[in-house]
């Protein structure tokens, strides 16, 4: 399948090609500049100010759900993958194995509970669902994203005002965002979630880290030493949320350099393919109903797009984005989402 904007022709000799030697050199310069900015400006300033807060005993906050439950899907596949079926090739190729849920991190790294997110989980309607009880959509049942419905039902504020609001209808519908649940529970996603998951998995010997995951653990250990505060204390704090964004920027800058090097090596070896187009034409699609999901870790957290194809047409498409997890309205059983809890 080909996503719009992805296939850019590669030619080292053609000056008008979207990707040529001149433009690759410009990309390399930009990558090096980003690494310089993060390492020599962003992080030093961030840590200097953060250290002052720590010395003053102002590592506070800790709202949201980071102490209770965080979720991730994993990111940065090393090589092309064949999807999430057949044992989950996506999970075999990712470099950042944050495909898990960590619960009770606030009680300590070694006391936290880690549950892997697997290929089977993606198909299980008991694992991942969305509800619309407090969202402006019809049908409040908990549905798997493949079965999800998005038929609008806007009801306005508590008094039924649809243009000039007076009071939020907290007991009714009050958001355009659905409520995603993991095994019936709320979860927080984002850079902080990724760092909590990787750090916990490595420290509990559940993951043998590659160079990128080791970098994440070393980053957390270095900050813990600088602040003289345990990771389960500073990571879920307001300071920790801010710091992990900076650490994530440093990691991504290194990832840019790493994958750029792989691209240059591929081109040098004569590999200039930009996409696999075997499934581009709908005539190649099966006539029976098929379902699929695309996963990733966007900068803001766990991202998933779910599609069902029937009779060679898209019959359903649902996106459960990071903000769906963090900014969702409450659930009567699961409680409040990360944003609501923080407020």
Residue ranges of model-derived segments:
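A translation/RNA-centric and nucleic-acid-associated enzymatic feature enriched
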Residues: 305
